[in-house]
């Protein structure tokens, strides 16, 4: 891509890191992990004037290595690519490790809603829910999903496409579940109009 196309792609890529920067305080420490070279370049470009630390390595290993931080309470936001079926198992294992090492952390996991990955998603959520209830450091947890299409309508000859997104939250702060459910209901109403 040429320079103008790269600038446009950088603007589109901002995503989670941009949101984290918007809602962070000056005293907060932000760490971003990216392994893929093109995404790493976009991340560095978007964050060049920010006080952030960018790690170029496997996110699951980095997540475990960076915890626990010096602060007592914090947020881990994990939004894997889920390109490989084993990403579901890797993220599950990593989040359980983080929870054991840093039991005061709020852990938020994004996951895609895809027909072709329905079993992997179900297994991931069941394992995390069981861990939160029965693990060495039990905590509250919940999931919230935003369905934007009928799953059956996403089927194509090349497979199925994204029909929504979900978030699984471990150790949520007070009222987060209610707030997220209200926001998802509001977004769904808007999408029905469009």
Residue ranges of predicted features:
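Class I S-adenosyl-L-methionine-dependent methyltransferase catalytic core
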Residues: 1-194
